[in-house]
């Protein structure tokens, strides 16, 4: 075979292989991205964030420092004791996060949507679980958070902010007074972002008796109890309980 013909044949074959490799590479990238968008939720759930903030810093794959967190303190606004709210903020600042507070009873849905969309992660503080869910549904924040978590935005929940992710929050009656702040609230459907029921503050003062009663009365549910020193970390479909039990 003449030299020029062999050279031409080599160029054609090389081009075909190069195109095939390029298409295969792009196919893998698209498939991975599509799957990631569907399933890669990132959720960090705890009872007392100030006690487990270090766990978050060690388990996230991307650095937190310099990111902005949408901080929702709404569950606490009618509570007598709220020190945990400031403790949570201080723990976030210690991780290098910038806080954008959004008390959802003071904003309309469009404003809340913009803040949640602009921030890098979402933090929902503790307080009354039923009041929090009532205001989530009233403002549309429940749907906004489900949308953001579905897109892979990191969600950090503390206490009530943890329990609202369950399929239903009626089991929280053992811990929170649902009649005092929400006398007309009777839709106990949770966000349903998770398919289990976290029992926060398990065997932790002053909720020792309340959490034990939940374990006894709701043994038919897939409960996951966590103490103040533990956290539930979810990546996609993988779930891990981290930290030490008290």
Predicted regions and their residues:
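Short, active-site-adjacent cap segments at secondary-structure transitions
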Residues: 130, 162-165, 231-233
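Class I SAM-dependent methyltransferase SAM-binding "motif I" and its flanking Rossmann-like core
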Residues: 82, 134-135, 141-204
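A residue-level signal for conserved active-site and pocket-lining positions in enzyme catalytic cores
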Residues: 69, 122, 159, 198, ...
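Short glycine-rich anion-binding loops that position phosphate/pyrophosphate groups of nucleotides
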Residues: 77, 127-130, 161, 203
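Patatin-like phospholipase A catalytic core
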Residues: 47-49, 230-231, 235-246
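Conserved anion/nucleotide-ligand pocket segment
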Residues: 189-194, 198-235
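N-terminal beta1-alpha1 cap of cysteine-dependent amidohydrolase-like domains
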Residues: 34-121, 125
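Bacterial Sec-dependent N-terminal signal peptides
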Residues: 1-28, 32-33
